């Protein structure tokens, strides 16, 4: 396979483990998200769907060329993650539509992520 498919309900902790062999820098940044307790419960789909302009996940995923897969009943559509974010607090998501999955290219060593913050975790935003 040339891409990695990540279900929207994948916790940040599980994502860190799964992504490390392919994108170690992204995995290292995930360790800086929130706290261990939050990473064990929070999902990557929720991180994206929330649409927060201070979220750490979307900048790294956009830099990786991620595709977002949305669903409403039996209707599915895909779009580049960068096209999902329209404006501050506004996403390209229709009523009843939810994030089903994210796919990213499987290539390795193409991204460097660094989180600049005063604290190791529970601080905001990253540079990718």
Predicted regions and their residues:
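C-terminal structural segment of proteins
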Residues: 1-128
